Amino acid sequence: MSQLRATKSGLVVRAVICIFIFLYLRNPTPAESEEEPAQPEVVECGFYPDELCSALFEGKGAAPQIAKFCKTPHKSEIHAHLHTPGNCSRISRGLHFITRPLSAEEGDFSLAYIITIHKELAMFVQLLRAIYVPQNVYCIHVDEKAPMKYKTAVQTLVNCFENVFISSKTEKVAYAGFTRLQADINCMKVLVHSKFQWNYVINLCGQDFPIKTNREIIHYIRSKWSDKNITPGVIQPLHIKSKTSQSHLEFVPKGSIYAPPNNRFKDKPPHNLTIYFGSAYYVLTRKFVEFILTDIHAKDMLQWSKDIRSPEQHYWVTLNRLKDAPGATPNAGWEGNVRAIKRKSEEGNVHDGCKGRYVEDICVYGPGDLPWLIQSPSLFANKFEPSTDPLVVTCLERRHRLQVLRQAEVPIEPHWHFQQQSHFNMRLNR
């Protein structure tokens, strides 16, 4: 009997906590209007996930803790569409893809995307549909090591869009290895020979997500970097020179690929190039991509990069500092809001700490990072793991889609909405 009473007491305590959580999320802050929107059926966490997302974006102190007790978004819809090949109209509508240019300005300025993926199928779909518009073009590099079921599902989606294709040449991508750089080069070759015209190319990985809309990305490029490449970076610091002075060869122990150092020292860079260190992420003009694929300096630099550690952190920025390269920025530094990343080494200076968890030096975002993310001037953010914290991407995705549709200058198709009614209690224009 005493055990039964204890169980009942525990249930009562949980019920009281749930009521408090619900009232907390429903209670507006003083700056918010007391007028409430039309209300659908109440569930255990309010109008899930909108109200919880609103509380997270507004930085309400208890919201990240509350998020742990609420149900996670259900991804079965995405998997059901892709593991059951069928009518492409059903797939594009069911997965809420935008199927027309949203303004004349966007229709006249096409972007190319390179997306390298190897896991998290639902996250890939969320990323692609966030950046997808029919006037852009997308090259997907699927890691050769990815499971066949994963590859088949990606192919099912890609088959439904004329402007999305999978790279014909794939790599077994190694962390910090040359294959990461080669995967981008493979896609660039496909993009320049495709029938689609594009102005700039942007590279992404499967753990990135946009925090700016397509229109905002175009405005940023045109206003700040017209006909210029964005490759944030500086002359290689002394403390990381071992990455390029010592040889790092890829090898495969028990199925994983690594690029550890060996005892052989590298030859000097070709053409007496000054080596820079910077971001692996870029925004490049089409002419610069054509230069990368044809110029002897670029070809020799690519060959030299085959046995250095993390060559993608050196290759793009080094070549973009050449004065004769198309769109070059020889005097640039770290400027260029390409990616919002929280590094552990920068905690306290650049950001207020990771609210999720650090993997190596990089923050995998948690719900508590959302206020920082939406205030960032960057175009994209990294790093997300929906398998760990699915609500982070879900909140960003819903907010992003509302912003996209608010900026549209064409009639909105019903299937572009994620739900019939939105219950975000926040200002999207801040």
UniProtKB/Swiss-Prot annotation:
Q: Where in the cell is it found?
A: Golgi apparatus membrane
**This protein's record includes keyword Transcription regulation:** no
Q: Which residues are glycosylated?
A: N87, N272
Those parts of the protein on the Extracellular side are 26-430
- EC numbers, comma separated: 2.4.1.-
Query: Transmembrane ranges?
Result: 9-25
- This protein's UniProt keywords: Disulfide bond, Glycoprotein, Glycosyltransferase, Golgi apparatus, Membrane, Signal-anchor, Transferase, Transmembrane, Transmembrane helix
InterPro entries assigned:
Glyco_trans_14
Its UniProt pathway annotation is: Protein modification; protein glycosylation
The disulfide bonds in this chain are: C53-C205, C139-C354, C160-C187, C363-C395
Membrane topology according to the record? Single-pass type II membrane protein
Q: Which domain of life is it from?
A: Eukaryota
Give the protein family: Belongs to the glycosyltransferase 14 family.
Protein role: Probable glycosyltransferase.
Can you name this protein?
Probable beta-1,3-galactosyl-O-glycosyl-glycoprotein beta-1,6-N-acetylglucosaminyltransferase 7
This protein's species is: Homo sapiens (Human)
